[in-house]
Amino acid sequence: MSKELSPKYNPAEVEAGRYQKWLDADVFKPSGDQKAKPYSIVIPPPNVTGKLHLGHAWDTTLQDIIIRQKRMQGFDTLWLPGMDHAGIATQAKVEERLRGEGITRYDLGRESFLTKVWEWKDEYATTIKEQWGKMGLSVDYSRERFTLDEGLSKAVRKVFVNLYKKGWIYRGEFIINWDPAARTALSDIEVIHKDVEGAFYHMNYMLEDGSRALEVATTRPETMFGDVAVAVNPEDPRYKDLIGKNVILPIANKLIPIVGDEHADPELGTGVVKITPAHDPNDFLVGQRHNLPQVNVMNDDGTMNELAFEFSGMDRFEARKAVVAKLEEIGALVKIEKRVHSVGHSERTGVVVEPRLSTQWFVKMDQLAKNAIANQDTEDKVEFYPPRFNDTFLQWMENVHDWVISRQLWWGHQIPAWYNADGEMYVGEEAPEGDGWTQDEDVLDTWFSSALWPFSTMGWPEVDSEDFKRYFPTSTLVTGYDIIFFWVSRMIFQSLEFTGRQPFQNVLIHGLIRDEQGRKMSKSLGNGIDPMDVIEKYGADALRWFLSNGSAPGQDVRFSYEKMDASWNFINKIWNISRYILMNNEGLTLDVAHDNVTKVATGEAGNVTDRWILHNLNETIAKVTENFDKFEFGVAGHILYNFIWEEFANWYVELTKEVLYSDNEDDKVITRSVLLYTLDKILRLLHPIMPFVTEEIFGQISEGSIVTAAYPTVNLAFEDLAAHTGVESLKDLIRAVRNARAEVNVAPSKPITILVKTSDSDLEAFFNSNVNYIKRFTNPEHLEIASTIPAPELAMSSVITGAEIYLPLADLLNVEEELARLDKELAKWQKELDMVGKKLSNERFVANAKPEVVQKECDKQADYQAKYDATVARIDEMKKLVK
């Protein structure tokens, strides 16, 4: 057992050194018990781009809650940690650091640059693990993985080669999304579409014979030097006689043909479309149908190349302005039509993505997608929580495009393809024998290796490895809804293809962490929260309680310091009631307490309040376990909070004072036993959410670590509906008296007459047998409980189930004086309402003030209105008394 609890709860003291003690004791490793059912989770590997944010804290807290509970329930648990190399993101960070030193990756060369990236990785991997420790994550570091580890790299090469041999990976020249800042290809889901202010530029392309001009429109006039044709619909009577003729490309003054193609819609614009196969995906398809050349007029950094005439070397957006000016100068510009349109931006660098013809590697998705869709109709399907995300998954798989997997980066898994001077290509898991082979310089999309994470981390492709046989498929994946497409879907189809199994049985989807105004946290808004700052102020347990208790599966959660204050206050309450119980413990051990509680359950000892709290504890265990199993941690938290704060602390602990302050030593031992036993179960129930403080308190009452203590289970012997019903009626009576006192402004310290009328003889007997509790909580001068009590003329009355309660007021207050006081109070709230109403009716204030300031005034208005209405209700009640 540990040292005595400090008088005040100090999370820094409680949490200091605790994590290292757990690591030293190896309590986070699997038990190795082959008779136990395995339960495994692989951590969604954070990118080694920097420190973890609040979203990571939420994600990992939920996983830790699950794995800690399963460990306590006797499962053979594995929570496998690891990190992702995050190709484009990490490389961009390192290049940014190098730019600060005045150098580029090209100055260093590939090998030296990669050395710098590995140094970055080591630096931030250390930081991330320190953050995991502060969060209290019970991961098994002996199995830590990194996506560029040799074992995982071997899995990546095997998957690539196998898919290539099946014809499901291919290399070809197609239009892809190009990031000019990172100088790499992007997949469709790495492109974020944003509505931006732009324009349609209308231009005239003159027929070769000069007889007429065809008007075309584009949002990207700088690409016009890549135009190789204009298209018209072959059924469009305005233009079908022009098919086969030529137009003159302005500025370039070269001839390009007019082709007939259904891509040109007669109903849209002029019905004439310029065709730029190297810079537009639809034009690329038109070009293939008509065997048109592909002319790329842009460099990989977003500048114009030598085919752009005098605009060569210009940035694409500068070139756009210059080209438009030139078109106007030569009379080819018809008009500029301002319009908001959707433009793709790189998810990583934020720059506008350029559709660009490029030779890349692709994964053919049709059969992989079909397999994933079909699996959701089998017993091996993946269960989504909440279930609506199953539809999201299926919709994406039904509409998926081929996946571009090559990236023009240096940091990542280099593509296992080699070329020689004879134009031959070799694809294999190892380099080809002989000289003269050069490996493809591109690397694979980060998500290609991440898609293998659940099984590559378990030892695959070594299918006989102990971890793979024991812990795969994994039990549960926890992740945000923002990466269902990026990651979850890809893990499912790759796992089905290469292991024949689902990668995980369950997927718990959570939302995003937002600020108090509901905005997504971002650097640009400056509203990001560092979880380490929160932990420093409140402790990890308070942050974990907030994160677990704040939302339902699939929903976003709003962070606020007010909620953090409430979390800290709850833990402080637990600390204080624990100290109270321990201070009154008198050396009682948990084993003796358990034996005594058994006597309470069998009726050999104890009183009705003891049986009531044990019954409610039983219900709490059942409901919390049920909601944990459904990943409804918010519901479970609410149940725990209500039981601990309301039923245990506010009621039972207070009720025990009637016994603990008495002279009956036998009763005291029983009461202490129930207190200690219930505290023990509370700590175990809370431990998955609040590991640090529960370990600290548990050390006062038991040997060993709570990490491996048994999770509470329902004890049928504790079921006692009669005790539950009786004490709930007792509570109702006490609450009714307290509320009546408050309504007529009679202080709790002032003794009063209380009359309880009930025609239920059992209830009458119960109240009379527990009259000491009623007296302790209601402070009566006179208390009468009977079936025949005449209703007093001047009295406050309340009705509870089975009884009526009267508080005679004749000697307690002057009704006229109380009405006068209430009238003054009503005037006060009316004045406040008038002031806030005037402010909110000011259109300039509402339009110009910050939204949070306006909201604050609205909240004040609602608060004042509620107080006004309550005062009116109290006046009405008082007036009824004098009728």
Curated annotation (Swiss-Prot):
Motif window: 'HIGH' region: 46-56
Recorded catalytic activity of this chain's protein: tRNA(Val) + L-valine + ATP = L-valyl-tRNA(Val) + AMP + diphosphate
GO terms of biological process kind: valyl-tRNA aminoacylation
Record's keyword terms, sorted: Aminoacyl-tRNA synthetase, ATP-binding, Coiled coil, Cytoplasm, Ligase, Nucleotide-binding, Protein biosynthesis
Function per UniProt: Catalyzes the attachment of valine to tRNA(Val). As ValRS can inadvertently accommodate and process structurally similar amino acids such as threonine, to avoid such errors, it has a 'posttransfer' editing activity that hydrolyzes mischarged Thr-tRNA(Val) in a tRNA-dependent manner.
NCBIfam families in the cross-refs: PRK05729.1, valS
Full protein name: Valine--tRNA ligase
Gene: valS
